[in-house]
Regions:
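Surface-exposed, charge/polar-rich loops and edge strands
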Residues: 2-76, 80-193
């Protein structure tokens, strides 16, 4: 009698095990299918980005968008556009923004430029490695300049797991709105060069 009840009990658990196995297989199949689909979309996005960058980088520079054009500035139409802007650098507002590049850890050095009409455009003056001299001692440049470079869209909200901390002068993203508010600058372009 024990043999019959043991046999019946193991058969009752088999459908449950099969159902659980099927559910797990379906879950993993769906997850991997979703991840694969996401990778294909991401590849398409990256290839489109590379095409946009390559077509814009080597183009002759155009005048950077002025205030009336700022509402139309968008990542898909303006980012990496070769631009030029004229004005006076405001070195007293130069800010270090943490950067990690293929060259190692360091800082981007951002300085606002004031156009003749009063508009402000932040200029990324380049990368300075951590072990280099204090970037805040960079020579104060005076006079009118023409800057040529690539238009980049502001990077809001800090970096992954790190929020900008203006009170302690810790910047993790090139957030032109936050940089401008911290320095009480008005009429600031929503991009940097």
């Amino acid at each position: 009698m024990n043999d019959v009840s043991t046999s019946h009990s193991s058969r009752a658990h088999n459908p449950l095990k099969r159902l659980l196995g099927f559910a797990l297989a379906a879950f993993f199949f769906s997850t991997f299918l979703a991840l694969g689909t996401w990778q294909v979309y991401r590849l398409d996005y990256k290839l489109d980005l590379i095409d946009r960058v390559e077509s814009r980088v080597d183009a002759p520079p155009v005048n950077a968008p002025a205030a009336p054009e700022w509402p139309a500035v968008a990542r898909n139409t303006h980012e990496y556009l070769s631009v030029k802007v004229q004005g006076e650098l405001l070195p007293q507002y130069t800010t270090r923004v943490q950067a990690t590049t293929v060259l190692g850890a360091g800082h981007w050095l951002l300085t606002p430029l004031r156009r003749a009409n009063g508009e402000i455009v932040w200029i990324n003056r380049g990368y300075i490695p951590v072990n280099e001299a204090d970037p805040m001692t960079v020579e104060n440049t005076q006079g009118q300049f023409e800057v040529r470079g690539l238009l980049r869209i502001s990077e809001a909200d800090g970096a992954f797991l790190r929020k900008n901390d203006p009170g302690n002068s810790r910047w993790y993203s090139r957030d032109v709105d936050a940089l401008s508010k911290h320095n009480n600058l008005q009429m600031v372009a929503p991009y940097f060069i």
